[in-house]
Amino acid sequence: MGLDMYLTGDKFVPEYQDKFPRAKVDSYPVESQRLKMGYWRKHWALHNYIEANYNDGESLGKVELGPISLREIADAVEQGKLPDADYRGEIDAYHKEPDQVAATVKTLRDAADWLEKDDNTWKTVEYYGSW
């Protein structure tokens, strides 16, 4: 068994937006979309950091993250401030590789930028870890 980690974005288009009519699927208007923004496998250090610093204890693995939180997490990843995961050496080392660090930082910062984009929609970003 392993840890699968998802960063998703939900985008809701208000019905009153005449300039931005809702798309249709099977002739029904689409009021929201779920976007796959990021995925990690067995990145225990990142998971433990998010759970320790951003989970209110009641979310059962789901944590809503705002732009400030996403940037704080990206900074912690970039600066090597995640706690040691002590999961398995080769997996923990993989997530510390420069290209993996850069990809994680980019994913988190892109999600923060997406939240702040003013496009007359309502948006949320959620982290979810499943094991």
Residue ranges and their predicted role:
Residues 1-124, 128-131:
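Acidic (Asp/Glu-rich) sequence patches and key acidic residues
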